[in-house]
Amino acid sequence: MPSEWVFLIIWLIPMASGGTTAPSLSASPIVFARNLFRALNDEVPPVNMMVSPAAARAMTLVFMGAGGKSADELRSKLILGVSNKSEVAKQHAESWSDECSCAKRGVAMRLVTRLYVNEEEKIRTDFNSMALEFFNAEADSLNYLNPEDSVKKVNKWLEKQTFYTVRNLFTPEVFNPDASVILVNSLFFRAKWDKIFPLQLTKVEDFWINPRQRMELPMMRQIGQFRYGESKKLKSQILQLPFEMSNMTMMFILPTAIDGLAKLEERLGQLDMNEVAARSLMKEVDVTIPKFRIESSVDLKVPLQKMGINSVFEAGQANLSGVFEKKSPQRISEARHKVFLNVTEFGCEVAPESDVQPEVLKKNHDRKVFKADRPFVFAIRDKKNVYFVGHFIKP
């Protein structure tokens, strides 16, 4: 089976009726990832969950059209730092230009944004020009009085941008007379493990959901040189699996105790992923991780408000005057986040290889053992960004 990582975030911006100093922009994705994951963990029930901090990119575009308190909150909580919006846009475009051009290095990413506008509303031309130049965003008009045609148009575009992994996401009910702008941000990620897992070593084993409950699922295994660490502070093991021809890795953080995930995530709320990754060194490791798939759908409005982004969601408080030609009250009423993750022996959306050689497992008493047979945290990252972060709790 092919494997794919696909991130999709959709912001619905309907019409409502009736300068902080921060860390550098280059550091903001790492810190934002920590803050978002921490806020989300406070709200969601204990189920498989995954989120992409690339959500910050969609909200940065909202920041470009925001004013007053709305802009101040977004600047502060997105950790944009620079008060000049043109500099924010320029630096943002430069950082993502490097990331999205890495296909030749073994990892492929596609990050695209599109604005869908009720044809009764008009977007400022300067905002639209900026969105296209710096955010790879395009604006398109829709007739919300004809929701069937509108939903077909949007769903068709989403399918194409996600290589047909996301289908029929929207329903006609989304396009109603109260809606004004739909901002869609899509991140597609595809990669192959630097060292794939031998198929013949994948076996069905127990996965402990808690000390009293277990389920069977396929567990992949291999032995190799990987970045590995043990943290007394986190009471966890740390493992980084690299992707082929890339500086990106999938990091696993495995609590020592079967029921240690909650305490681990509480401690992780005080650290960023770079700090965690720094605790690992190259070691020979016997690795066993589950073959798993996550489909996660999250309402981001609650965690974003918990982080302090409130004004843009509140009627009579939101200021999006930089988006529309006419001055009228607007607010973001809903934020949906949908993501898919499929982890296999080969990586991400990579077909099985016919020339994979069997692996002989030799004994080595100095070898570290990393067996993820209980709930764990994972992150797909490099030193500059956290692209996905989540936890796996049960099959």
Q: Predicted regions span which residues?
A:
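Secretory/exported precursors with cleavable N-terminal leaders
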Residues: P2-P395
